A protein has these predicted regions:
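N-terminal secretory signal peptides that target proteins for export/translocation
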Residues: 1-2
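Short, polar/proline-rich extracytoplasmic segments that appear immediately after membrane translocation
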Residues: 5-51, 324-327
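Long, domain-scale functional regions
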Residues: 46-334
């Protein structure tokens, strides 16, 4: 009996050791497999006109848009988003969810008013309460044009002077026939972006800015950048809203859309009207601004001719590209 008892003890100890070793071995094996798999996960490239571009999560490059599903945006100080269009350098702002490409001219055009004095009368445009100072709405809309808070409202039955210039003059006379064939008419979000004074849960955000922009659309050939295009292009985590940028200095830097290059100053109109909760500023429009100490969005009277148009168009979804998107090897349309 004693001998049998000893054999049982040896058997139990052996079984315990075996089970322990198997458990440790499995855990080690499983850990190795898990680490191996994680270490080989790769971000799926995005098709940019037939060129595979791998999205990034930091630094300059192509990002998945965190605000709109299916959309990709270029961000940072100088991402590789240069494209030759109309025999000029432009930049790709985004690949839209519908597959089209939103592009912006690398250089601004000559300064001009967003909306010339008395271009739109109050009789036909009741939103435009100060026609002698112009009006901040890009194009005519049906029904009533409202600011996000509803503090400003009225009809806008006529287009801004800058919209007429870009589509009836610039598009006709300055975009060549090849480029026209590469473009597509597209909707632009022309709603107002509101400057908010609240804090906490009621404070401004890029989500609110986008929602304001999307309240009204215009479909056509040539527009301007959205306020949110400029904000989303920044990799500075402090760039959280139009209000933050307006009240600050460089919260929205690290941003190719606010790169003044060798110039002393960059001033260009966006496509969005500016509004305040208090109302009474129908003649204001947003613009992008950069100098030696600032990189931000701000607003200004639409009748001033000290800001420039910076044209934005959309390329067709079946656009095919060559190149790497660098200044020396920009994307080219084939």
């Amino acid at each position: 009996k004693s001998k049998l008892k000893g054999q049982k003890q040896i058997l139990l100890v052996g079984l315990f050791v075996f089970v322990t070793l198997m458990t440790i071995g499995y855990a080690a094996f499983n850990t190795n497999i898990t680490l191996h798999v994680k270490g080989n996960i790769k971000t799926k490239p995005v098709d940019i006109g037939g060129v595979d571009v791998t999205p990034v999560t930091e630094g300059d490059g192509l990002y998945e848009d965190e605000y709109e599903e299916g959309r990709y945006v270029y961000r940072g100080s100088n991402p590789n988003n240069y494209i030759m269009f109309n025999n000029e350098l432009w930049r790709i702002i985004s690949k839209e969810a519908d597959g089209t490409y939103k592009i912006i001219r690398n250089d601004v055009l000559s300064n001009r008013a967003f909306d010339e004095r008395n271009h739109r009368s109050t009789d036909n445009n009741s939103y435009c309460t100060d026609p002698q100072y112009g009006c901040g709405v890009y194009a005519a809309v049906s029904g009533t044009f409202l600011s996000p808070s509803g503090s400003q409202s009225g009809t806008v039955t006529e287009d801004s002077s800058i919209k007429i210039y870009l589509n009836d003059d610039y598009y006709v006379n300055n975009i060549n026939s090849t480029a026209k064939d590469q473009m597509t008419s597209h909707s632009f979000n022309i709603g107002a972006v509101e400057n908010l004074n609240q804090s906490g849960a009621e404070e401004d955000s890029i989500e609110k800015n986008i929602a304001g922009e999307k309240m009204y659309t215009w479909t056509g050939n040539v527009g301007l950048a959205n306020v949110s295009d400029i904000l989303r292009a920044s990799t500075n985590p402090l760039c959280t809203s139009a209000t933050t940028s307006f009240n600050g200095y460089k919260e929205c830097n690290s941003n190719y859309l606010l790169d003044k290059g060798s110039a002393s100053l960059l001033n260009y109109w966006t496509i969005n009207a500016s509004s305040y909760e208090s109302g009474g500023n129908s003649h204001y429009a947003w613009y992008g601004f950069a100098n030696s100490s600032h990189a931000s969005v701000s607003n200004y009277g639409a009748y001033y001719s000290s800001r420039a148009p910076r044209p934005v168009v959309f390329l067709k979804s079946d656009t095919t590209l060559n190149g790497s998107g660098t200044p020396d090897d920009p994307f080219t349309i084939v």
